[in-house]
Amino acid sequence: MAKEIFQRTKPHMNVGTIGHVDHGKTTLTAAISIYCSKVNKDAKALKYEDIDNAPEEKARGITINARHIEYETANRHYAHVDCPGHADYIKNMITGAAQMDAAILLVAADSGAEPQTKEHLLLAQRMGIKKIIVFLNKLDLADPELVELVEVEVLELVEKYGFPSDTPIVKGSAFGAMSNPDDPEATKCIKELLETMDNYFDLPERDIDKPFLLAIEDVFSISGRGTVATGRIERGVIKVGQEVEIVGIRETRKTTVTGVEMFQKILEQGEAGDNVGLLLRGVDKKDIERGQVIAALGTITPHKKFKASIYCLTKEEGGRHKPFFSGYRPQFFFRTTDVTGMVSLEGKEMVMPGDNVDIVVELISSIAMDKNVEFAVREGGRTVASGRILEILE
């Protein structure tokens, strides 16, 4: 069966659902998908089970990897990632967040903000997301007086993490909307959410004119066709026949892109902001991995030692309770990869939670990096600091 061509008729934007485990992120994603399929006959409805589609996830009822769906509103085409809320899987949320232009924060009205609500807000802020919309879910289960308190609490939290004070709140029941797609009263919250997304989220400025770069999120082999690397194009454009380099973790190697697809449709060219699959000539699945980048020839190089400015989270923000010293070895998250690195402090004996400091880091393997790239620092399953590269040393 021939694949259809992706028609670029509306501006494209990447959004995602974030928030605490069990607050209803996947249910909301499914409700949006079902609602859009009713409004737009060409759209395909994805049920909850289709989004949570790995066996382990079905068993535990939690989302582990970020899942992508697509839908259209009157004005835009959205790619939507459903981000995991479960603590062990925050690492996957980081790669999901790295692909988002804006986010929908889910908060259950019957329980209010919880620890992961805060961690996700912090990660969203670190990953450069500028605007969020709050979806106050499970309204049918909550005491109306409690809902008002939760609203105030959530807006305070949103402001605390640097998001605008006029962040909109949409209230409803994602489960109600998913279960009763033909009831206008039940789906009113989804309609309102989509309208708010169209009006409130600014279309991102895409770096189309810069040299091509995509951070690999996943690698598949397709029998008879070769190896496909998927991820979001961070900058530039990519066309079939273009020569590229695979950089980081291993030796840099050249290859040619023989196909570009998005949501199983063929693209004439992939542009900054698109979530694409690239078919690569002569590359074996075992030769490339998540965390490498595919880039225009000679535009990015792998490094392992750099100077960075970091902010250490306080205990209240979910960070460390104690200071750290030179020789500290946490995980550094860049784009879609995490690498262990050793911290050296210059002219400072220790770093306390809440400090802003400059450090030197030496990673155990080289990864593709540029000046000004942001990263998260994690240890023992939690984010302890966030930072930005000031200078590449070697």
Swiss-Prot record:
One Pfam family named in its UniProt record: GTP_EFTU_D3
PROSITE patterns: G_TR_1, G_TR_2
Keywords assigned: Cytoplasm, Elongation factor, GTP-binding, Hydrolase, Magnesium, Metal-binding, Nucleotide-binding, Protein biosynthesis
Region (G1): 19-26
Residues the entry annotates as binding Mg(2+): 26
Enzymatic reactions: GTP + H2O = GDP + phosphate + H(+)
Keyword Magnesium: yes
Region span, G5: 173-175
NCBIfam families membership: EF-Tu (TIGR00485), PRK00049.1 (NF000766), PRK12735.1 (NF009372), PRK12736.1 (NF009373), small_GTP (TIGR00231)
Subunit structure as annotated in this protein's UniProt entry: Monomer.
Chain's role: GTP hydrolase that promotes the GTP-dependent binding of aminoacyl-tRNA to the A-site of ribosomes during protein biosynthesis.
Name of the molecule in the record: Elongation factor Tu
Organism of provenance: Borrelia duttonii (strain Ly)
Lineage, highest ranks first: Bacteria, Pseudomonadati, Spirochaetota, Spirochaetia, Spirochaetales
